[in-house]
Swiss-Prot record:
Its cofactor is (R)-lipoate. SUPFAM superfamilies: Single hybrid motif. It comes from Chlorobium limicola (strain DSM 245 / NBRC 103803 / 6330). The modification N6-lipoyllysine is found at K65. Gene3D superfamilies: 2.40.50.100. Keywords: Lipoyl. It comes from the Bacteria. This is Glycine cleavage system H protein. The glycine cleavage system catalyzes the degradation of glycine. The H protein shuttles the methylamine group of glycine from the P protein to the T protein. Binds 1 lipoyl cofactor covalently. One of its GO terms (biological process) is glycine decarboxylation via glycine cleavage system.
Length: 127
């Protein structure tokens, strides 16, 4: 199970990666989440310009087995939705790379400190 050390994680199995400018970040689902969901067939996300509160639902992932809500790790505004998700299987194939979901402008970058680091996420999923 891949759990990169340079990301932050939520208890809902989303990851967030702060981008170089420090005010924007990419958000996706973890390798653990995509593995548990199985083959992802459709991703529905709120559009760019949507303002989000931390823990607010920003979309859904539909897999063969189930449908799961996606929760914003921090408050912010969706700047971009990943256009590659028309081929939803990219989330299974590369959850930390090409399978990212949204790019958000973060209201408070310090709020990332409240999220789990890689070691805490490993503990959460029992690795």
């Amino acid at each position: 199970m891949s759990i990169p050390d340079d990301l932050r994680y939520t208890k809902d199995h989303e990851w967030i990666k702060l981008l170089e400018d420090g005010s924007a970040a990419l958000v996706g689902i973890t390798d653990f989440a995509q593995s548990e969901l199985g083959d992802i067939v459709f991703v529905e996300l709120k559009p760019a310009g949507t303002k989000l509160k931390a823990h607010e639902v920003f979309g859904t992932v539909e897999a063969v087995k189930t449908v799961a809500d996606l929760f914003a790790p921090v408050a912010g505004e969706i700047m971009e939705v990943n256009g590659s998700l028309d081929a939803a299987e990219v989330v299974n194939q590369d959850p930390y790379g090409e399978g990212w979901l949204v790019k958000i402008r973060i209201d408070d970058p310090a709020s990332l400190a409240e999220l789990l680091d890689a070691a805490a996420y490993r503990e959460l999923i029992g690795e």
